[in-house]
Amino acid sequence: MASIKPLGDRVLVEPRQEAEEKIGSIFVPDTAKEKPQEGKVVEIGSGKYEDGKLVPLEVKVGDTVLYGKYSGTEIKSEGKEYLIIRESDILAVVKK
């Protein structure tokens, strides 16, 4: 797991990994693929302040979430790719 602790209302998400794709005998490179918009919450911030009170985040570590296509900041840590996004950029929690 990454040793990154998001601040405030931010969430650290590990995007779902796509399998390598081939169309016929042609390999489709990562740069030509759509980025996944689903991932697993790895770490969460402490929450956000509203009217002087700390409001905890609704998502929890381990939740699978859907987020906007252009949401967040991509980072790499310990050889893995992560996104740091605001909780407000999370569109839904996937119930399995």
Curated annotation (Swiss-Prot):
Q: Does the keyword Lyase apply?
A: no
Q: Which CDD domains match?
A: cpn10
MF terms in GO: ATP binding; metal ion binding; protein folding chaperone; protein-folding chaperone binding; unfolded protein binding
Classification via InterPro entries: Chaperonin_GroES, Chaperonin_GroES_sf, Chaprnonin_Cpn10_CS, GroES-like_sf
**Which cysteines in this chain are paired by disulphide bridges?**
none
Q: Which UniProt keywords apply?
A: Chaperone, Cytoplasm
Pfam families listed in its UniProt record: Cpn10 (PF00166)
**Known SUPFAM superfamilies for this protein?**
GroES-like (SSF50129)
Record-level GO BP terms:
chaperone cofactor-dependent protein refolding
Output the Gene3D superfamilies linked to this UniProt entry: GroES chaperonin (2.30.33.40)
Location(s), subcellular: Cytoplasm
Tell me if Chaperone is a UniProt keyword of this record.
yes
Q: Which SMART domains match?
A: Cpn10 (SM00883)
Question: Which cellular component, as a GO term, is one annotated location?
Answer: cytoplasm
UniProt family annotation: Belongs to the GroES chaperonin family.
Subunit and interaction comment:
Heptamer of 7 subunits arranged in a ring. Interacts with the chaperonin GroEL.
Quote the function comment for this protein.
Together with the chaperonin GroEL, plays an essential role in assisting protein folding. The GroEL-GroES system forms a nano-cage that allows encapsulation of the non-native substrate proteins and provides a physical environment optimized to promote and accelerate protein folding. GroES binds to the apical surface of the GroEL ring, thereby capping the opening of the GroEL channel.
Protein's UniProt name: Co-chaperonin GroES
The gene name on file is groES
